[in-house]
């Protein structure tokens, strides 16, 4: 099954865990042996962290592959994939490492397995420096399913920094091929809704204050829509540890979804958390794109694998997206074109079209 070995420099561009996720997923799918060097070389703690290690081990187990150099602090790994298999797969970051990032690396792979898969993922569900599980379910899921597959995400327990302890179960069936997507029409915002949560010992008032501050902030800019942010106390048996946060979603007439989110930290008042999420949402609505800045890079691997030409309209192209494109071109040989949007209404905005000629990956098992 092995093709020529792909050599990846883990220190370029985004220079972090994302390079590992994109390169190992594509290596696994395409059956290409991989060596990644200089892993997280520029970070304050270089090399693999626990959450990267659990992602690598999961990919190895998904395809009965061989993995060398995979230990905490290691800056070089080699990976030799074999055949992707369905069934039950488990990954545990043993920290507050993000379950959503584990989904990012494993999901494209199990779409091309021989049978349905069940992914048991343990770690942080609402963690810093990663999508919150609510974002994954409320924004990522409905958009990524346009590629022609569906998945189910069951949140068993929520887990927060620093303990983790969350668990989600993702169920999905394989596909023959992925359809290309065309997301270029923004439409107008028709709904704004969200949830502000507290868990553990934090008082419910914190959730109400986050929600109220976010609503006030949004109203300054968008006056004609009801903003429905529900304050939520997470049930004791469904949350591990203490945490608070908020996610706000804007939905448009064409089915586009944008989000702003924020997590509470010790010593940061609730209003500030709510306002930060609201401002992030408003910033994502100001450009003429059809996806927000966090969805951009999560769609690149699927666009690269799809059978045909995909197009998405975005605001400024993030470093994560540029990095994902770089490795999708290097490893999968997909062809991307990024150009400024030529639409009249986008003229004054920083709006781009990302176009990809996908490789038409076909599931050999179906």
Swiss-Prot record:
GO terms for molecular function: ATP binding; RNA binding; RNA-3'-phosphate cyclase activity. This is RNA 3'-terminal phosphate cyclase. ATP binds at residues 104, 131, 294, 297-298, 320. Belongs to the RNA 3'-terminal cyclase family. Type 1 subfamily. PROSITE patterns: RTC. The active site is at 320 (tele-amp-histidine intermediate). Its EC number is 6.5.1.4. It comes from Homo sapiens (Human). SUPFAM superfamilies: EPT/RTPC-like, RNA 3'-terminal phosphate cyclase, RPTC, insert domain. Pfam families: RTC, RTC_insert. It is found in: Nucleus, Nucleoplasm. CDD domains: RNA_Cyclase_Class_II (cd00874). It comes from the Eukaryota. GO terms for biological process: negative regulation of optical nerve axon regeneration; RNA processing. Catalyzes the conversion of 3'-phosphate to a 2',3'-cyclic phosphodiester at the end of RNA. The mechanism of action of the enzyme occurs in 3 steps: (A) adenylation of the enzyme by ATP; (B) transfer of adenylate to an RNA-N3'P to produce RNA-N3'PP5'A; (C) and attack of the adjacent 2'-hydroxyl on the 3'-phosphorus in the diester linkage to produce the cyclic end product. Likely functions in some aspects of cellular RNA processing. Function plays an important role in regulating axon regeneration by inhibiting central nervous system (CNS) axon regeneration following optic nerve injury.
């Amino acid at each position: 099954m092995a093709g020529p070995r792909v050599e990846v420099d883990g220190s370029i561009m985004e220079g972090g865990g994302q390079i590992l996720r994109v390169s190992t997923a594509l290596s696994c799918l395409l059956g290409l042996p991989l060596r990644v060097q200089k892993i997280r070389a520029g970070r304050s703690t270089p090399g693999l962290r626990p959450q990267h290690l659990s992602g690598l081990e999961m990919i190895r187990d998904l395809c009965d592959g061989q993995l060398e150099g995979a230990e905490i602090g290691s800056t070089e790994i080699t990976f030799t994939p074999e055949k992707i298999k369905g069934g039950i797969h488990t990954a545990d970051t043993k920290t507050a490492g993000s379950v959503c990032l584990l989904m990012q690396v494993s999901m494209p792979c199990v779409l091309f397995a021989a049978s349905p898969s069940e992914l048991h993922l343990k770690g942080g569900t609402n963690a810093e420096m990663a999508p919150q599980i609510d974002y994954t379910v409320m924004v990522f899921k409905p958009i990524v399913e346009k590629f022609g597959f569906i998945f189910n995400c069951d949140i068993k327990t929520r887990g927060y920094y620093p303990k983790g302890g969350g668990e989600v179960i993702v169920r999905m069936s394989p596909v023959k091929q992925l359809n290309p997507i065309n997301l270029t029409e923004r439409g107008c915002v028709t709904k704004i809704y969200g949830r502000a949560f507290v868990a553990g010992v934090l008082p419910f008032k914190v959730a109400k204050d986050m929600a109220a501050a976010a609503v006030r902030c949004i109203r300054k800019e968008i006056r004609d829509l009801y903003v429905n942010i529900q304050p939520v106390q997470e049930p004791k048996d469904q949350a591990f540890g203490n945490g608070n946060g908020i996610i706000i979603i804007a939905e448009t007439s064409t089915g586009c979804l944008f989000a702003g989110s924020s997590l509470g930290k010790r010593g940061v008042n609730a209003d500030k958390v709510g306002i930060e999420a609201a401002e992030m949402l408003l910033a994502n609505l100001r450009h003429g794109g059809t996806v927000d800045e966090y969805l951009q890079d999560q769609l690149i691997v699927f666009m690269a694998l799809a059978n045909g030409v995909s197009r998405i309209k975005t605001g400024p192209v993030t470093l994560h997206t540029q990095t994902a494109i770089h490795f999708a071109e290097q490893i999968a040989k997909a062809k991307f074109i990024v150009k400024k949007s030529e639409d009249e209404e986008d003229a004054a905005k920083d709006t781009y079209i990302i176009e990809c000629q996908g490789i038409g990956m076909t599931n050999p098992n179906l």
